[in-house]
A protein has these predicted regions:
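Short hydrophobic beta-strand segments that form the core of ligand-binding sensory/regulatory domains
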Residues: 59-61, 81-85, 130-137
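Basic/polar phosphate-binding segments, predominantly the helix-turn-helix DNA-binding elements
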Residues: 205, 237-267
Length: 267
């Protein structure tokens, strides 16, 4: 197994670290990075782009010829990461000994943490994995260009739990948007803007998905509560006459016993 450790920093720092760790060739231009790998350990490509509002997107397509554990410094308490797997699988854990969450083909994951603990990705020998990452930094709200999007992401996804990794099926519309993102080839500022709009659209869909799920859960809970209340009312209405009748019978029975006893004593 090969263990690789990356320091936290800008996307440029991360790609420089990957270049050194994997003996790769890095090309960068206008906040875009392209890393080509062809060694005894890995073969493939990693591409990344960063936007002015604290959002970074990364696409990975790699074949591993050995097991690899890639450990990265803590994401930071204000970071949110969305992961989307398109081919095969990989695993995520907080720390090397933390719980392993498998992110499979056509599945996605939400990752955030409010503790200083490394984020670890686990890759397996003789597998070709394809996945996309979208990292959102919400710590600079107020200074960023698109405050409302970052604010809503922070409000919706930053969890108060120490470490959080949720995995589930991909949203089909988001998967289609990611495919479209990969087809954008316009150079320079035009391509940059098109890619930014596409990624922001994906993030808005993530917010809507989460909000809709919470609303459905709330409706379900409310319906369940109303149903239980109605059932209790039915039970009460069913039991009530029997309860009153039973009490009345006990009172009358006691009263009759007293009268009979008094009559016998007098005679």
């Amino acid at each position: 197994m090969k263990n690789i450790y990356l320091n936290a920093g800008t996307i440029s720092d991360v790609f420089n670290g990957l270049e050194n760790s994997f003996s790769a060739i890095l090309n960068s231009n206008y906040n875009e990075f392209k890393l080509n790998l062809n060694t005894n350990l890995t073969k493939g490509q990693i591409q990344g782009i960063t936007f002015i509002n604290g959002i970074t997107a990364v696409q990975v397509e790699m074949t591993f010829f050995d097991d690899v554990m890639l450990s990265m410094e803590s994401l930071g308490t204000s970071s949110i990461v969305f992961a989307y797997c398109d081919c095969d699988r990989f695993k995520h854990s907080f720390g090397s000994t933390g719980q392993h969450i498998s992110i499979k083909k056509h599945h996605s994951a939400l990752i955030n943490s409010n503790r200083s603990i490394n984020t670890v990705l686990h890759f397996y020998k003789n597998t070709t994995v394809q996945f996309s990452l979208i990292k959102v930094e919400t710590g600079n709200i107020g200074k960023a260009v698109n405050d409302s999007l970052l604010f809503n992401l922070k409000k919706t996804f930053l969890n108060k739990q120490p470490n959080n990794c949720y995995e589930g099926l991909q949203n089909i519309k988001i998967a289609e948007k990611l495919k479209h993102f990969k087809t954008i080839t316009e150079p320079g500022m035009v391509g940059h803007i098109l890619k930014k709009d596409c990624i922001q659209s994906i993030l808005e869909m993530e917010i809507n998905d989460n909000t809709a799920a919470l609303q459905k859960l709330s409706v379900s809970i409310n319906r369940s509560a109303v149903k239980q209340i109605n059932e209790l009312k039915k039970m009460y209405n069913f039991i009530k006459p029997y309860t009153i009748g039973s009490v009345y019978q006990k009172v009358m029975h006691s009263k009759n016993k007293i009268l009979i006893k008094s009559f016998l004593e007098e005679n």
